[in-house]
Amino acid sequence: MENLKQLQERVAVSDGRAKADLVIKNGRIVNVFSGEIMEGDIAIKNGYIAGIGHFPDADQIIDAAGEFISPGFIDAHVHVESAMVTPSEFARVLLPNGVTTIITDPHEIANVAGEKGIEFMLEDAKGAPLDMFVMLPSSVPATEGEHNGETLHAKQLHPLYKHEKVIGLAEVMDFPSVAKGSADILTKIIDAKQEGGRIDGHGAGLTSADLNNYLAVGIRTDHESTSAKEALDRLRAGMFVMLREGTVGRDLKQTISAVTEKNSHRFCFCTDDKLINDLLTEGSINYNIRLAIENGVEPITAIQMATINAANCHNLPYLGAVAAGYQADIVFLKDLKTIEISKVLKNGQVVVENGTRKEAAFKKENKAKFISPKINHHLSIKDLELPLTNETCYVIGMQQNNLFTEKLMEQVTIKNGKFVPSIEKDLLKMAVVERHHNTGCVGVGIVKGFGLTEGAIATTVAHDSHNIVAVGVSDEAMEKAIDHVTKTGGGIAVVDAAGNVLHDLALQVAGLLSDKPYEEVENDLAGLLKAFNQISKAKGFDPFLTLSFLTLPVIPELKLTDQGLFDFATFQIIPNEVN
């Protein structure tokens, strides 16, 4: 929060009575209010822009040499945990991509560790040159009946609004509870409103009629559009629409045609869930901007969507523009179409120069500490058996680069009254093992699309309850993979037919995040993908993040939880066998 002295100093700079800390000269300023390219010196004092005009003197002068000057980019909805690194490490990845602000929903770690998980994320982000605003998780667990680590009711969330970085209520995923007027979810919404916060939606699979329930209680954003029609339905209903491009949820190309000159002010960008390797090769919101431009959106419009629109969406009045009174979060662009970044300023400090981080800006004196809850289950190989009497079964149809699944009906092989995986038909066994309370709950189902020819993979990243999920060709291989991630305290493992671990990634923080530098995580993810390719013929997608979403019941169409097979259409557990 600013004080009187800082405001007085900024005013003195703006009217020429005092020198600026920094002046940027010879830049072409992207005016996100008017849609114009403008010229003028940019004077910065105490991390804020004091004025644009003629400012001949400063402690430091940067010659932009004709480059474009854009506001810092904003990711309007992201789960840091999907990158499998801590917030302070996440900042090191994002700043070279021009992202200076994120709005995050830490519901992954909250599902494992409750309020302590949220507090850890807030603490770890302190001191990093990145604004991390938090939307409090609304649906922990995502649906009734799941076994996650902690349950967060309104009374647990309310005290967290005191934190200056908490700005609202995150994606309301439990649509049925909204529709039936559940007191707990509506109290959470009321609390957010009373604190002046926004309320995010999660309208996966909802029709325009369903959206009335959302709008009626005050939900004002959505990031789950997978088609232009869905995006327009949400826009017409009065929502801000976040166009998503992540690792699995790749929806921007299918939704971008909804954006027009008249309505673009209601659209912004998000990544939602994106792995480190994709962030490093493609980028973050800068990639969304490029993709939008490649698909017909004017460059300045795309930049507006990534900056001022996102700030307006989340009611952040001092972010998203290069103008007097705004935070000096600035990106230097060599070209508006390619969005090639040369320099990034955060709060008026250069944090990226010539595309390279200035590491001194990213050093944290005290690293936040987190004690992970112990993985707590006792699994027998018999728990992985799937008894069947009917050869016609429901099968989870995994779709590459898509969060939705298909509800398939397939003829399966039964031997001695139990399901037997088929490599030829690509019908594999999938299991979800409850890991938080030693309930003994194990959901077993059938999945198609992973193309395994041997072995198994397992992970403790399993949205949103984050139990252990595994898929494999044999029970023995699945048991080995599950046992390995249990012994490491959480993580991802690939095993071969003999049960040998081909590669793993330990996730020491809640079984979700590594406490290592992102470079090590990137190397391990590459090793995991190489190991997966040794045991699978399926290519062109990320198998680990894809697997982690096959347990999320609030996204259509068929998912698996520790309670069994979950049908989104009926919002209930169904048998594996078709009648």
Curated annotation (Swiss-Prot):
One GO MF term: adenine deaminase activity
Catalytic reaction annotation: adenine + H2O + H(+) = hypoxanthine + NH4(+)
EC identifiers of the protein: 3.5.4.2
Keywords assigned: Hydrolase, Manganese
Cofactor entry: Mn(2+)
Pfam families given in the database record: Adenine_deam_C, Amidohydro_1
GO biological process terms on file: adenine catabolic process
Family matches, as InterPro entries: Adenine_deam, Adenine_deam_C, Amidohydro-rel, Metal-dep_hydrolase_composite, Metal_Hydrolase
Gene3D superfamilies assigned to the protein according to its UniProt record, in alphabetical order: Metal-dependent hydrolases, Urease, subunit C, domain 1
UniProt superkingdom: Bacteria
Recorded family membership: Belongs to the metallo-dependent hydrolases superfamily. Adenine deaminase family.
Protein name from the UniProt record: Adenine deaminase
UniProt gene name: ade
